[in-house]
Design a protein with these regions (language model features):
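A generic structural motif
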Residues: 66-68, 194
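Glycine-rich, often proline-containing surface loops adjacent to acidic residues and nearby aromatics
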Residues: 25-41, 68-77, 152-164
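Hydrophobic alpha-helical segments and helix pairs
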Residues: 26-64
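Hydrophobic, Leu/Ile/Phe/Ala-enriched alpha-helical segments that form helix-helix packing faces
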Residues: 1, 54-62, 179, 183-191
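N-terminal low-complexity, intrinsically disordered segments
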Residues: 1-31, 35, 200-206
Length: 207
């Protein structure tokens, strides 16, 4: 990573250009947070190792300690390109049955314009370890009104989060490994089969 720049709001960003496969790593230092990412990694292990290296070095170079930590997140993102009404696709695919279906399919409804579910659960008794899933559409009211859609990414985000100060302290590396394991399990057993695949199949069918 050799591209270093400062954003208008003051953040420092270190990144690399896309390789032949579209992979790209980046690191951002905000006033109150360290953020890093690996876009389209060759495998999830590469992304995990990148995170481990950064989290191992950060406390020494930035003089960080347990009192500086609020929470650590591991986020998996899945992008599905779709040229159409993202909100309608989500409504038809994930909310076609159940009590909420009556709201979305009522005879007075002409279009779904904002269907972006955001769900969170605790996976620990102390509620310090949490998992969230969020679906983000990128369809505007103008596109729906004119029926002229751009091909854009419908995004599904899976977040595993751990808060500090509730249970016994652990190192950043240990927490990162634990959160990565949780995210891997949730992605493989729940998010991909229950959310990503149904949406991908609906897009492929031309819904």
């Amino acid at each position: 990573m050799r591209k270093l720049r400062r954003r208008e709001e003051g953040s420092l960003v270190l990144e690399e250009g896309d390789d032949d496969e579209g992979s790209r790593r980046w690191l951002r230092l905000d006033e109150d947070a360290i953020r890093l990412g690996y876009h389209s990694p060759p495998c999830t292990l590469d992304a995990q190792q990148f995170g481990q290296v950064v989290l191992k070095m950060a406390p020494y170079h930035l003089t960080l300690g347990d009192l500086d930590y609020d929470h650590l997140e591991v986020v998996y993102g899945f992008d599905l390109e779709y040229q159409g009404n993202h909100d309608q696709l989500v409504a038809d695919t994930l909310f076609s049955e159940g009590p909420l279906a009556g709201l979305l399919t009522h005879e007075s409804v002409t279009h779904a314009i904002d269907v972006q579910p955001f769900l969170g659960v605790s996976v620990s008794e102390s509620c310090d370890t949490q998992v969230y899933v969020e679906i983000k559409s990128h369809t505007s009211a103008y596109e729906i009104r004119t029926q002229q859609y751009d091909a854009q990414q419908l995004s599904v985000f899976l977040t595993a989060r751990k808060y500090w100060g509730i249970t016994e302290s652990e190192s950043l590396g240990d927490v990162h490994r634990a959160l990565t394991a949780i995210a891997e399990e949730w992605a493989a057993e729940r998010i991909v089969p229950l959310v990503v695949n149904p949406l991908a199949q609906a897009i492929a069918s031309g819904r």
